[in-house]
Curated annotation (Swiss-Prot):
This is Keratin, type I microfibrillar, 47.6 kDa. Belongs to the intermediate filament family. Gene3D superfamilies: 1.20.5.170, Single helix bin, Vasodilator-stimulated phosphoprotein. There are two types of cytoskeletal and microfibrillar keratin: I (acidic; 40-55 kDa) and II (neutral to basic; 56-70 kDa). Wool microfibrillar keratin. Residues 204-219 are annotated as: Linker 12. GO terms for biological process: epithelial cell differentiation; intermediate filament organization.
Length: 404
């Protein structure tokens, strides 16, 4: 914005003491524009020498000074406006455009690390499953070992019971054998006593007496003993067979019970192992799901933190840009206000200049001479002032001044 005013006549007349006279219609009023120009500017006090009084000179000097101050202020505002435009241009050129940082490499690294973490977690889960399977196998073998140990203990208990029975049978056999031996000894003693008695009787009777007695035939003790032995042996054999049959039946029943119990135990153990495997598999899956959830929560937390940081950066950038925009808007509003003020000042100055120009042009025809000038605007010589302003003189057509 520039104000180029061409005021040759005004500058020329401000350098001398002459001043045009304002028409009588302007007397007692102020000139256009909010400059509060004194009303004495329009007073038409004319002296025959063409000079003005001191009040009019001071008013003219005041107006010229105000015009010069306005022009100086306009130039200063133009310089400030140019400086502000230059600063805005430099700032707009220096300010780098907003470029979002490229995080693709970091994202790729994060994805690779996440893949490695997932692979490690799957490998750990596989190893955990293998360890659990080994534990289950060891538990199975331990259960089988305990089962075999319990079966061995049962068989040993049965053997101990059978040994006790065998010992009892052995004792019973020994008792029976002792009884047989005692009976044999008693039989031998009886035979010896009988023979002694028979011999004694024979020796007493001699040959004199031959008594025949119809008596029952004598019993063969050997035969009786043999029969008794046979009976006892048959009884022992019968008892032994009965005991063996009872032992076999008890053993078979126990074996059946042990087999059924072992089958039930194996089925229960298999079911328990299957349930343990299922529980372990479910626990492993649950642990994997927990790990996946923790990983996803950590990823979500990291993503939220990263995006919150980016959001804070963007918000701070937005706040900075908004502050810069507000500053630019305030500068623009201030410059607009200054521009409006300058436009008003320009309008007032143009109005005043036009008024001054009209006044000067209207008064050029009334001035007899200019004591400070020797030529007019056309370059023609101006005649000297005369004391009688009523004498007719020749005027210059283009500039409307008197010549001689």
């Amino acid at each position: 914005m520039s104000f180029n005013f061409c005021l040759p006549n005004l500058s020329f007349r401000s350098s001398c003491s002459s001043r045009p006279c304002v028409p009588s219609s302007c007397c007692g009023t102020t000139l256009p524009g909010a400059c509060n120009i004194p009303a004495s500017v329009g007073s038409c006090n004319w002296f025959c020498e063409g000079s003005f009084n001191g009040n009019e000179k001071e008013t003219m000097q005041f107006l010229n000074d105000r015009l010069a101050s306005y022009l100086e202020k306009v130039r200063q505002l133009e310089r400030e406006n140019a400086e502000l435009e230059r600063r805005i241009l430099e700032r707009s050129q220096q300010q780098e455009p907003l470029v979002c940082p490229n995080y693709q490499s970091y994202f790729r690294t994060i994805e690779e690390l996440q893949q490695k973490i997932l692979c490690g977690k799957s490998e750990n889960a596989r190893l955990v499953v293998q360890i659990d399977n080994a534990k289950l196998a060891s538990d199975d073998f331990r259960t089988k070992y305990e089962t075999e140990v319990s079966l061995r203990q049962l068989v040993e208990a049965d053997l101990n019971g059978l040994r006790r029975i065998l010992d009892e049978l052995t004792l019973c056999k020994s008792d029976l054998e002792a009884r047989v031996e005692s009976l044999k000894e008693e039989l031998i003693c009886l035979k010896q006593n009988h023979e002694q008695e028979v011999n004694t009787l024979r020796s007493q009777l001699g040959d004199r007496l031959n008594v025949e007695v119809d008596a029952a035939p004598t019993v063969d003790l050997n035969h009786v003993l043999n029969e008794t032995r046979a009976q006892y042996e048959a009884l022992v054999e019968t008892n032994r067979r009965d005991v063996e049959e009872w032992y076999i039946r008890q053993t078979e029943e126990l074996n059946k019970q042990v087999v059924s119990s072992s089958e039930q135990l194996q089925s229960c153990q298999a079911e328990i192992i299957e349930l343990r495997r299922t529980v372990n598999a479910l626990e492993v899956e649950l642990q994997a799901q927990h790990n996946l959830r923790d990983s996803l929560e950590n990823t979500l937390t990291e993503t939220e933190a990263r995006y919150s940081c980016q959001l804070n950066q963007v918000q701070s950038l937005i706040v900075s840009v908004e502050s810069q925009l507000a500053e630019i808007r305030s500068d623009l509003e201030r410059q607009n206000q200054e521009y409006q003020v300058l436009l008003d000042v320009r309008a007032r100055l143009e109005c005043e200049i036009n008024t001054y120009r009209g006044l000067l042009d209207s008064e050029d025809c009334k001035l007899p001479c200019n004591p400070c000038a020797t030529t007019n605007t056309c370059g023609k010589p101006i005649g000297p002032c005369i004391s009688n302003p009523c004498v007719s003189r020749t005027r210059c057509g283009p500039c409307n001044t008197f010549v001689h």
